[in-house]
Each structure stands twice: as C-alpha cells, then as structure tokens.
C-alpha cells in the first residue's frame, strides 16, 4: 500500500490548522521539523504495519488542532520520539530548532536507565509530573501522545491493550482533568473503558445505536421546530442532538442503579449561538435568558427542570441554561442553551 498520499494529507492538516495563527517563519520551522521526523523514522513501522511517521504527525495534529498550541509545541510533537528511537540527539535538535524546542524534546523523551528507582513505568510517571515544573507544554505533548496511542490501540495484543488502558484510566485521564483538558479527559476515559470492559462497552454502544435510530426522526423535527422559533426572532444558532458516550452512560447506570433503557438523559439537545452574529448588544448570559424566554413561550417547560449552570458551572467549567421542553410528540427533551465560547471554554 502506498502511504505517501496519506502521510502528506495528514501533515497538510497540521499546517492548515496552524496557518492562521503563526508567522511564515514559524511555519517554515514546523515544516522543517516534519521533514526531519519523516526522514528519521523512515525505516520504522508501527505494530499495525503503518509507517511510524503517521504517529508523530497525528500527535502534532492533536496539539495543533484540538489543543490549539504554539509552533514550538507542534515542532516538539513532530520530534517527540526522534531522540528516543533514532540516532538524533538533543544537541542535534538544539542546533536546528533552538533551546526551547530542545528542552521540550528532552523532557518528553523517556530517559534510559540501567536501574530504575521503582519500576520503569513509575519512573516515567514521575518524569511526566516533574515536567510540570519545567513547562506544561511538555505534558500536553505527552497527553496527546497517549491520546493517539489509545485511538490506535486495536493493533496491540490484548494484554498490552489492558495494561495501557489501565494506565490511561488511572494516570493520564485524571492528569488531563487536572489540566483542564476536559474533552481529552473524556476521550481517554471512554477509550480506556472500551478496552478494559469490552463486553459492557459493546453492549452500550449497540444500545446507543438502536436508541439513536429509534429517536432520530423525532429529534430532527424537534430541533427544526426550536431553530424555527429562534429564527423568527432573529437568532441564528445551531441546534444539535448529542448522545452521551458509553463510559458516561455506564457510570450513570451504576450511580443510579438502573439499566440502559431506564436511564434518563441518554442524550441532550444543545442550542449554540455566536455572540458576533447577534444584533442585540447583550451579554452571553442575557442572550441565553432571551432564548429561554422565547422557547418557553412556544414550548411547555417541565416544572422544576430549570438549572442555571451559568451561575453554577459544572466541574469542567461548562456553562449553560438547562431545562426540559415538551416536544409535539409528547416527549420531554433535555435542552441546553449556551454560546460557542462557553462550549470551547469547557473543552
């Protein structure tokens, strides 16, 4: 199989994600880092048989697109395995990319020791935590590295899958949570659950697919009705249905001691608006309240369902107004009202 078009396309996605926010000089350095990583890893393959270079490119894409970090961090992501797995040294990196990148690459490189103080894995954890004092960008690269490894874990042996998934759940997901990377934390937890509890994950995924198919048309009509109501009052917004992930469903089932089909709020409808498209000079909170007032004129609100998570945000800083509205089909729908900025802040 010719992987060259895949490699080039993935690398271009990194460049495109960075282009709006870095200088042409920095873009040249990023491209230079990509070419060095591609040359250094050329002979290497992943367990799946794919060229190894796909991994550092994917990590760089997470850093550039999902975490929105700077050029030097993306360069570090491209080079994060170069010193560990190829003849290149930290001094080589310093000569080409400067002290900042060299320092970051040195921190993310697993240190080879003859004797480990405890175990190799525990020493690695200690190195990651110690890097928090050096530069948090290094930890961001390590977490991105783990996220891509979890997304491609299917190529590993079952015992390795279980080991890596356990490490992810116990160390990397809580670390991502502490750093405020709530979307990454959720991804890591869900992927870990997929490999640690394969049967439960498979059952819930199948039930979710069935539930979505059974309710899709009704929810599409409800979203269309909501969007139409708001459009009539000059409010442009997105109205979408979001289904909770298997790990979130499983955790809620355990907490509430119910089966899947008796679990409430398996999905929610989110109304998202952009401040710069609003004609009225209102704050985000005022716009949320305006949308709430408009909707409760046209739809029946379930008594006692209103929750103001703008004044009292969730742990992940997610802010919204929550309520239950009655659809034309007579179903109470879980609705969340928020701005695009509120969503981004929680991720």
Where in this protein do the model-derived segments appear?
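Short, mixed-charge amphipathic alpha-helical segments
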Residues: 17-33, 90-100
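Active-site alpha-helical segments that house and flank conserved acidic catalytic motifs
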Residues: 73-81, 141
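Nucleic-acid processing machinery
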Residues: 1-23, 38-44, 53-66, 70, ...
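Transcription initiation cofactors for RNA polymerase, centered on bacterial
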Residues: 104, 108-113, 135
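Hydrophobic or amphipathic alpha-helical targeting/insertion segments
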Residues: 78-85, 89-107, 181
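Generic alpha-helical secondary structure signal
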Residues: 9, 28-32, 36, 100, ...
